[in-house]
Amino acid sequence: MKKTAIITDSTASIKPGEINGVYILPLQVIVDGEKSFRDGIEIDYDHVHKLLKENPHGLNISTSLPRQSDLLKIFEEIKTKYDRFIFLPLSKGLSGTYDMLVQLAKELSEQNKDKEFLVFETSDIAISLKWLVEDIKALVDKGCDNQTIKAKVESHKQNILSAVTLKNLVQMRKGGRISGLKKFITTLLRVKPIILFDKGVNTLGAKVFSFSQAVEKIFGFVKTKFGDNYKIKRIGFCYSFCKNYANEIKKIITDFIEHNKINFQNEIENAFITSVIIVHTGIDAFSISLLIDNK
């Protein structure tokens, strides 16, 4: 059986060392256009949250690709332990990380003929990317071949949907990670935009005035994509505000599921937001990610 390492990036809501055989490549946070910090290593969620809170009208902060040197360092440290290296980066619709890894994997393959390198386009991010990593890890541990792993990635992409409800579009506009902003003008401060993340890209889905309206809209997106009789396998909940608000919204989600008799039998999973992600969402935002059971 091939000894396999999985390499994902720091947007996947996985902490270094959390999953055996899974390695985290940090993206970068750029402050004031010049100071670069590696996500989860030199800067964290709390630091970025503080900066954003101190600058409510917008902050000169952005994100950037991982450093090539960080990937090469990871590879040098683990190359003698593994025969196969599987890369599961965030969606190429959000970042150039995938393209960078494709090129680096090609170079590494030419230099290491006895190793195998596979880079997959996940169309994913955050907690649902973590789910994919966990599923691929389970297949790897069973000794599954490349075709089985590829099929799982493709199946996962077809059965996920995420939506982010924002306080405003200040940071999202700065990041340029969304289409359709020209059609959206927030004339009322209480309007909360919902960003739909589907098929690897962000689009402006709707605008609402309350958390309960946001939850209703998000499950409406799910119904539109998957039909009336969908069954939810996993629900992930991420947030960038205080715990009291988080508990309030989580209860709204749970009550909505129960009231509408939605087919979901498990617990809603919480996940931390990395500094790279909060740079774009800003504070007082939350996301709901869903994995549909297609069996």
From Swiss-Prot:
Domain of life: Bacteria
SUPFAM superfamilies the UniProt entry points to: DAK1/DegV-like (SSF82549)
A molecular function GO annotation: lipid binding
PROSITE patterns registered for this protein in UniProt: DEGV
Keywords tagged on the record: Lipid-binding
Domain DegV: 4-292
Positions bound to hexadecanoate: 63, 95
Disulfide bond entries: none
Pfam families noted in UniProt: DegV (PF02645)
InterPro entries: DegV, DegV_C, DegV_domain_contain
Cited NCBIfam families: DegV
PANTHER family per record: DEGV DOMAIN-CONTAINING PROTEIN DR_1986-RELATED, FATTY ACID-BINDING PROTEIN TM_1468
Functional note: May bind long-chain fatty acids, such as palmitate, and may play a role in lipid transport or fatty acid metabolism.
Protein name listed in UniProt: DegV domain-containing protein MG326
Lineage: Bacteria, Bacillati, Mycoplasmatota, Mycoplasmoidales, Mycoplasmoidaceae
